[in-house]
Amino acid sequence: TEEVVPVAKELELCINYLHMQQVRFGEALTFSIDVSDTLQSGGKLPVYSIQLLAENAIKHNTLTREQPLHIRISGEKGTGKITVSNNMQPKLSIEDGNGVGLSNLAERYRLLGKPGLEISRGQGEFSVTIKVLTDEHPDN
């Protein structure tokens, strides 16, 4: 199986996943994507990395029509990074909430010899920023 895929393909996988989740949650889930075309065509990401971050947001937050969860995926070529952020509406209890998803993604970056994740929480928002891999990496 592929370890890394083009950013555009990874975004497509995540968009398909989010559309399926919108069928499930309806108006309780919204998302937006603003990733530059240059970044989409010029870099790669570990497979399912963006989807994992979107899943993480859905798993750890309450989604209601009155207070929808909004997932934002953004990235500019100048930064070489993609950020997945969401408004924080923490669930009171989380099944299997042991942080395996983020740890797994950080480990995948480590194995690729790249810096890990940048995680931030503040002002009602949670975000994870990941590095887009370029052709300087021998496996790309």
Identify the residue ranges that each predicted region occupies.
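C-terminal end segment of the histidine kinase catalytic
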Residues: D135-N140
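Two-component histidine phosphotransfer core
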Residues: T1-K131
